[in-house]
């Protein structure tokens, strides 16, 4: 059989599955656009409104709405959309064939583990084994260790295991997006429900990444979980790719008794036709920034900002639509859009796109050795300098979040890695103390060797003199020289056997944290303007580590 190696995760059951990402606005999809130009009450009453959308050509129906006491009229496209085109339907597989094809594509992941952090908990998902929840060691993220270490007193909860007779696999779709779902049972017993914990693991095609990654984990009800994994593997088969993401505009105008008169009906839609081009341009540019470890629910770019997750979108619809009188100020403050003159504002009711709530998590690892600073971000080998340059170019770092720390302003990377500074200094202090202790031990050992050598020499000389007196020959010099050479060789061998801890320490990597403040990279005790300065400062510290005064200068004294 094709998938014998997946015996533990194979099943013919095709039960219905739950998807927390279901979207009430998925079909049809709309964006709400507020035009800057108001309409005259007389034009609205006389029906001087276009009957078709000037960009898409769809018939329009109109509804009067009121926001904060201001009347608005909105043109709603009268269309019906299908979830899949005819060509897509022709290429669809049967449920069993789709499941087997999806399992085949995911086969290379078998035995690999993915990790995810949420709050105080960490999750480990090993394909073919199961999902485990535990509390990570330490109360903060720093220094970052991957995979997240487990606290000594943390219990381990198995949320679900791949068991041959207790695992079901299905391929289904929600919101037009097909995915492979594993229903894992046999988890740790839950005292609140009296049953074992269960989890549904959903694999969805994610074309924007190169590696498998956990998108989110939710507890949909007590001890019953859903986890979604984004993977490029399913994208190899177009039948598992999501349908094209298209939305139709709902254009709204404020209605006023006195408003400028348009020369033509089409004049009301000036500035609308170019919106699509702007969206595509910004989307293409933003895709250069998104990396494999971006922690995101379905993120896409539209016009000038990021979309909200779908669940959060619903909460914000009322906020924006309820404050349309001051919408220009509101949009600018929230960073949603800064439209040019006569261009429409855009609010998307399907997946909101303001940047603030999107968490962009990167695994940042800084290593300072005695001679070299190493820096990397586990994001397709893109360095922090390159990302920082990109954020600077955008002119807005106010809501960037790295490893749980929020950028506070545009001045620079503030508090990115500040929390690890204390740990670094403790480590350096510890190393300094160890170096001092080692030096004292070496000195004591050397003193003992010298004393032993003197005792041996004295004994040899005494015996040589006695021997010379007995036989009447002068053998003092040769005998003394022989024993002295032997004694020195033994001491030298003992010295070589003693490990030089100071030299070993110079080659060890120190996992450290830096932060950027007032235009300078800093570590506690250092204020340097660039990486070369950091390397120089660390090298100076290494060169002077045996000098108590120098340790005191760097804040490393006992």
UniProtKB/Swiss-Prot annotation:
InterPro entries: Man6P_isomerase_rcpt-bd_dom_sf (IPR009011), MRH_dom (IPR044865), OS-9-like (IPR045149), OS9-like_dom (IPR012913). Its main location: endoplasmic reticulum. It is found in: Endoplasmic reticulum membrane. Disulfide bonds join 113-126, 190-223, 205-235. Pfam families: PRKCSH. One of its GO terms (cellular component) is endoplasmic reticulum lumen. GO terms for molecular function: carbohydrate binding. GO terms for biological process: endoplasmic reticulum unfolded protein response; retrograde protein transport, ER to cytosol. Residues 435-508, 539-558 are annotated as: Disordered. Keywords: Disulfide bond, Endoplasmic reticulum, Glycoprotein, Lectin, Membrane, Signal. Residues 441-466 have a biased composition (Basic and acidic residues). Residues 474-492 have a biased composition (Polar residues). Glycans are attached at residue 68. It is a peripheral membrane protein. Lectin involved in the quality control of the secretory pathway. As a member of the endoplasmic reticulum-associated degradation lumenal (ERAD-L) surveillance system, targets misfolded endoplasmic reticulum lumenal glycoproteins for degradation. Belongs to the OS-9 family. Interacts with missfolded ER lumenal proteins. This is Protein OS-9 homolog. It comes from Yarrowia lipolytica (strain CLIB 122 / E 150) (Yeast). The lineage of its organism: Eukaryota, Fungi, Dikarya, Ascomycota, Saccharomycotina.
């Amino acid at each position: 059989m094709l998938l014998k190696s997946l015996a533990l995760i194979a099943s013919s059951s095709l039960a219905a599955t739950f998807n927390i990402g279901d979207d009430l606005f998925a079909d049809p999809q709309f964006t709400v656009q507020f035009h800057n130009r108001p309409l005259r009450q007389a034009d609205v009453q006389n029906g001087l409104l276009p009957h078709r959308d000037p960009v898409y050509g769809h018939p329009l129906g109109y509804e009067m709405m009121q926001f904060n006491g201001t009347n608005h009229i909105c043109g709603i496209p009268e269309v019906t959309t299908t979830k899949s085109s005819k060509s897509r339907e022709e290429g669809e597989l049967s449920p069993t064939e789709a499941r087997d094809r999806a399992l085949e594509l995911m086969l290379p992941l078998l035995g690999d583990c993915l990790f995810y952090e949420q709050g105080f908990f960490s999750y480990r998902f090993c394909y073919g084994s199961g999902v485990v929840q535990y509390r990570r060691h330490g109360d903060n993220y720093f220094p970052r260790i991957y995979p997240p270490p487990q606290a000594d007193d943390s219990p381990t909860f198995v949320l679900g295991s791949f068991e041959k007779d207790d695992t079901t696999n299905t391929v289904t779709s929600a919101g037009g997006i097909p995915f492979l779902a594993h229903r894992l049972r046999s988890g740790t017993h839950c005292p609140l429900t009296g049953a074992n914990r269960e989890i549904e693991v959903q694999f969805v095609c994610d074309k924007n990444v190169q590696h498998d990654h956990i998108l989110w984990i939710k507890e949909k009800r007590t001890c019953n979980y859903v986890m979604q994994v984004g993977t490029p593997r399913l994208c190899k088969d177009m039948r598992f790719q999501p349908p094209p993401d298209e939305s139709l505009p709902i254009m709204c105008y404020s209605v006023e008794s006195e408003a400028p008169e348009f020369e033509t009906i089409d004049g009301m839609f000036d500035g609308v036709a170019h919106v699509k081009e702007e969206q595509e341009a910004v989307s293409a540019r933003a895709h250069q920034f998104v990396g494999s470890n971006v922690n995101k629910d379905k993120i896409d770019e539209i016009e000038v900002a990021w979309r909200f997750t779908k669940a959060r979108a619903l909460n914000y619809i009322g906020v924006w639509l309820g404050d349309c009188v001051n919408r220009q100020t509101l949009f600018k403050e929230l960073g949603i859009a800064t439209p040019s003159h006569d261009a429409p504002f855009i609010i998307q009711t399907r997946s909101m796109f303001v940047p603030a709530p999107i968490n962009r998590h990167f695994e940042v690892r800084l290593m300072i050795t005695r001679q070299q600073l190493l820096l990397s971000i586990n994001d397709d080998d893109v360095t922090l300098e390159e990302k920082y340059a990109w954020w600077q170019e955008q002119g807005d770092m106010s809501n960037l979040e790295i490893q749980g720390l929020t950028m506070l302003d545009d001045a620079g990377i503030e508090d990115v890695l500040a929390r690890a500074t204390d740990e670094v200094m403790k480590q350096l202090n510890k190393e300094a103390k160890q170096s001092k202790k080692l030096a004292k031990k070496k000195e004591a050992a050397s003193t003992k060797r010298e004393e032993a050598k003197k005792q041996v020499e004295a004994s040899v000389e005494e015996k040589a003199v006695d021997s010379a007196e007995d036989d009447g020959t002068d053998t003092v010099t040769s005998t003394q020289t022989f024993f002295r050479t032997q004694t020195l060789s033994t001491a030298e061998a003992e010295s070589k056997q003693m490990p030089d801890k100071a030299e070993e320490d110079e080659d060890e990597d120190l996992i450290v944290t830096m932060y950027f403040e007032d235009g300078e990279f800093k570590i506690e005790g250092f204020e340097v303007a660039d990486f070369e300065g950091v390397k120089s400062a660390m090298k100076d510290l290494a060169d002077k580590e045996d000098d108590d005064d120098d340790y005191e200068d760097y804040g490393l004294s006992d």
